[in-house]
């Protein structure tokens, strides 16, 4: 086997391990908080195979209820079909759905346009970017290993989005700066901070009580978004007051400091003079 072919096979297997198909129930549990955002909008799901994607399923079956304008879905093409499951196609395609046409209020095969792409359907490709430009809101589960690059593209094209990522992404410099600048925030999240995803390439180490056949349990996953939600406006009940003697307090310029416990988030920070008045 040549070095080039060997690398392609390794990359293909690696790409397969980066695919986590999301449960319909998890999508529904999160999306119920965002319904007001979707009326008259074009939704783009660009990292889930539209032929098996629960994102496409959710939006197509709720198209009229949400008042969508258009639904588009694309996915990355198999580079070597023999390495992949029957869910993968040798050619990359995108699906376009413009709503119910025959009065059944359910998406049917003849109502969904299937268009073959010239390229591989990668979200970074020129074809995918042209589809992205049409979109108002992007909703999907992007590859965790490409999360920084994926979010960067959404910000570059000024798109609204609701996507799944690992909580470790918060520590990435690029993502942290977006959170700090109030350009991205966390959604409502998965129950218990863990999600079950369809992926046969990993062994499932979940406990017997938390095990689901054909799925892998992934801890620390979360929804990331720039869509406004009620959760962002909930008041935190704070009690702790800090003094300069206790530790360095944040300045008006937003200097951060360490808080060891959730309950120790500062109600306020006082100068020596201000503290003496309490």
Model-derived features: positions:
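Class I S-adenosyl-L-methionine-dependent methyltransferase catalytic core
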Residues: 1-278
